[in-house]
């Protein structure tokens, strides 16, 4: 009986020693025993191919770009968000300016040190951010997920899905993408019968000039809205500009006016400028007063609101096809 008691005591001591060693190792790795038992929360790669391994659902997310700001606000409650970019407060650029008021911290300074000061457990950014900045944040121990800026409407959906997964909001992401697919299907149902060569040619303007490069996101927005992007037709690309004479030669059906300006320029003044410019006197868009404004909050969007832009574009140019539609947003 005594021998057996010694064995039990020694066995118990050994178990305690192993448990203590396990906890010590877990702490050394920056985790807890519960985390190790539960396994990984997320293992995968971001859109740039960098491996990301996470052990728990994030509670303090920082977003550094407007596109990721808008997706994050649509998927996560404010208490899960530590900070957003300063752009999200600009109602001239952001579809989510009102929702963003629930998140008090907005970052204009996106230096690694400023981001670190927010104590984030996840940082969302995009491929437009310099690689050196991303590397510096990772060197400080921050977990950075880089999301690729979409060049097509189809690319918006995996972007929402991947962000939803990395922040622990997969169900919300699935629900959002479901609504967006329905929105696109509705536009297609209303416009699919319009022959390609009869679809209106639209030319969009920023205050600085013609907007809408070939094979960029706005170009695809137009395609999904059953419109032809005149700037792309004339050859506008990242490396190639087009002249106003080329715009005139297209004889566009519609001019889309800008709504946002960092210098305070006004849409109505721009409208009058086009109307009174002798160069555009005989262009169909001016002759028939098809000078429309689709807010730049949609035209520049690289989030779920890019899909909403398709709806707004189609409804603006084809109002008679949406006469029964109240226009509730699918993206917010």
Where are these regions (language model features)?
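Bacterial Sec-exported substrate-binding components of ABC uptake systems
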Residues: 2-6, 12-13, 25-69, 171-202, ...
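Short helix-initiation/N-cap motifs at beta->coil->alpha
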Residues: 47-49, 102-113, 150, 235-244
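A short, structured surface patch at a secondary-structure boundary
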Residues: 60-118, 122-127, 227-230
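Extracytoplasmic ligand-binding site segments that recognize negatively charged/polar headgroups
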Residues: 90, 132, 148-162, 197-220
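Proline-aspartate-enriched helix->loop->beta-strand connector
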Residues: 105, 111-128, 142, 243-260
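Short beta->alpha connector loops at strand-helix junctions that form conserved
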Residues: 126-127, 146-150, 233, 295
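Structured C-terminal subdomain patch of bacterial secreted/periplasmic proteins
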Residues: 158-165, 172-174, 178, 185, ...
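His/Asp/Glu-enriched short active-site or ligand-binding loop at hydrolase and phosphoryl-transfer sites
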Residues: 217-239
């Amino acid at each position: 009986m005594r021998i057996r008691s010694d064995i039990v005591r020694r066995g118990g001591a050994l178990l305690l020693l192993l448990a203590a060693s396990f906890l010590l190792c877990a702490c050394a790795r920056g985790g807890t025993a519960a985390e190790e038992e539960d396994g990984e929360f997320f293992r995968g790669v971001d859109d740039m191919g960098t491996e990301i391994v996470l052990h728990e659902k994030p509670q303090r997310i920082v977003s550094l770009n407007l596109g990721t700001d808008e997706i994050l606000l649509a998927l996560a409650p404010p208490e899960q968000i530590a900070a957003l970019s300063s752009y999200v407060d600009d109602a001239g650029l952001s579809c989510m300016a009102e929702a963003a008021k629930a998140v008090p911290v907005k970052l204009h300074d996106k230096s690694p040190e400023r981001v670190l000061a927010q104590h984030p457990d996840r940082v969302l950014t995009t491929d437009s951010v310099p690689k050196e900045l991303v590397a510096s944040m990772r060197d400080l121990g921050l977990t950075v997920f880089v999301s690729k800026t979409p060049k097509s409407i189809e690319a918006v959906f995996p972007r929402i899905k991947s962000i939803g997964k990395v922040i622990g909001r997969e169900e919300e992401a699935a629900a959002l993408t479901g609504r967006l697919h329905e929105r696109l299907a509705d536009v297609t149902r209303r416009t699919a019968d319009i022959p390609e060569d009869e679809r209106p040619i639209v030319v969009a303007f920023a205050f600085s000039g013609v907007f809408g490069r070939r094979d960029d996101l706005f170009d695809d927005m137009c395609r999904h809205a059953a419109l032809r992007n005149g700037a792309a037709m004339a050859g506008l690309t990242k490396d190639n500009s087009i002249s106003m004479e080329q715009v005139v030669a297209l004889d566009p059906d519609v001019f889309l006016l800008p709504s946002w300006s960092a210098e305070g320029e006004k849409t109505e003044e721009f409208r009058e400028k086009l109307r009174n410019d002798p160069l555009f006197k005989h262009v169909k868009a001016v002759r028939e007063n098809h000078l429309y404004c689709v807010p730049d909050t949609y035209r520049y969007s690289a989030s779920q609101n890019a899909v909403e832009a398709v709806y707004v574009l189609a409804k603006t140019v084809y109002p008679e096809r949406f006469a029964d539609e109240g226009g509730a947003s699918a993206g917010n």
